Amino acid sequence: MNTPTRSILTLATVACLLAFNAPVQARDATLAARVDHVLATVPLIDGHNDLPWEIRDRFGSVDRFNFAADTATLPLPANAAEDVVPLMTDIPRLRRGHVGGQFWSVWIPTTVQGPAAIKMTLEQIDIVHNLVARYPADLQMAGSADDIVRAQQAGRIASLIGIEGGHQIDNSLPALRQMYALGARYMTLTHTSNTDWADAAT
């Protein structure tokens, strides 16, 4: 096959591929626009995020943590275990993911029991409140569906609180009521150990 013929065949093949690819790209752009529209209209709610514990464990307080930066690039603590992974949540990624509401987990280890569990849970709730207060242009506390809608209309990410185990209330309904008053909106019955009133099946 001579060079001009080969060039013509190559150009024809490229033209066919481009012509075939154009509808696919248009379809992808249309689909992406539809997804963006839905997520701008209906809040996407993430039901679990362990960031409050990571802030406590890695930084000690919200003041030492830059949530507006790419948290995957933040240095790990000097005493970090080898299997510690970079953080996966920050404001830029929440925005890119169109997250409209985030349940921040106020998990504590099941080895912490009794009054100490209540104290540590309150400290974790305080981390969430401090995080929201530090980034008021991006985050807003929410305790109801109406609060989530208001946060979305204001262009903020609704911040809700979830308790990750019944051990965190030390068998105390008054403690649970006070945690609710501070913003907690769910509590799992158990985490990885039994309570006096629920079996973790582990």
Where are these regions (language model features)?
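N-terminal hydrophobic targeting/anchoring segments and the immediately downstream early-domain regions
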Residues: Q25-T202
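N-terminal secretory signal peptides that target proteins for export/translocation
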Residues: M1-T5
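Bacterial N-terminal signal peptides
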Residues: T10-A19
